Amino acid sequence: ALHLARLPLCAWTSFSALCRGIFRRFLTKRHMLDWVTDADSERFGAQGISFARDLFPLLCAVLLFFAPFTPARFFALFFLFAPVYCRLSEKPYKTNIAAPDEKDAEILTADAAAMWQYYTRFCNERNHFLPPDNVQETPVLRVAHRTSPTNIGMMLCSCLAARDLSLISSETLCEMLERTLDSVEKLPRWHGNLLNWYDTETLEALSPRFVSSVDSGNFLCCLTALSEGLSEYAPQCPKLWDVRARADALRASCDLSALYDWRRNLFYIGYDLEKNVFSDGRYDLLMSESRMMSYYAVASRQAPKKHWGALSRVMSRSGGYTGALAWSGTMFEFFMPYLFLESRENTLSFEALKYCVHCQRQFAAEKHIPFGISESG
């Protein structure tokens, strides 16, 4: 709709640029290298340019009103309201999420500090400073000495978050990241992608050896966030520049396109190294845990833009809410990518998140259980 509303303006701008280019090239031979950015043109001539932009769609609307055929009048009405529509669409986005007050901030920081103890306790020398997948507390304490690319990526980002919350110093952050990256660089990989599971005590890949597309995407997104965050603390601890370079090198070595089905424009679920075959299934829904991986792949040009359009947006309705569906409807599928991908209000992804919460709460109320069902149940 926005493109249609701006059609007269775009046509006029293109025609004007063409005429000026021909005039300067063949007649005046002057100002052929002049170029003014849109921001500068708005700053130096805001009133005149704004008036011209508003006037041209209105002029087209008036002319089309006198057209002899009815469809033209429809476009006339559309162009008539184009200036208002375009102005509203240009307003800067403002979030309605309120910041926690001082008391809530203290509670959240205390909870984060308690969660952080998981990494300080179990990312130890025995585990090669890699995060165990899980720890059983009862009836006996038992550590699962295995880890995945997602676990490792989240651990790296948790280190950065701990520094953001002043739970650790920049020097401690550097030390922890160096130790973990030392181990990651020793892990066997496939086309640069980490395998699905590793033994944290031996650093060997666990059988059956498998490369997960989603795990690879999660790891790459975590490395991207880590790299950006480290630039804030590197001036305090220059060694963090080297850590950042190592993270960037790991990211650059990963080839997601090796997991892409170019015929169907979808990502395979993964690659089985034991059988040397791709999995039969593919990630074909937008609202799934693979959304973050798909976004990264398109942004890094490891997958074409049409891949994003190939992801299905199957819709559903319940209790006045409408949203896109996931395969199993878990919180993990909907909200895991939200850790890194912003969902703005009145967008498809934002409405899908609201729809997920509504359905989860409705189901929990019927079954008299807490809401928030995820992969763990």
Language model regions located:
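Short acidic (Asp/Glu) and glycine-rich catalytic loops that position anionic groups and cofactors
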Residues: 1, 38-41, 93-97, 315-317
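Membrane-proximal soluble regions of multi-pass membrane proteins
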Residues: 1-40, 106, 110-118
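Alpha-helical bilayer-embedded segments of polytopic membrane proteins, i.e.
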Residues: 1-15, 37-86
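Juxtamembrane/interface segments at transmembrane-helix termini
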Residues: 13-31, 72-74, 81-102
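Ser/Thr/Asn(+Pro)-rich, low-complexity disordered segments
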Residues: 46-55, 70, 74, 78, ...
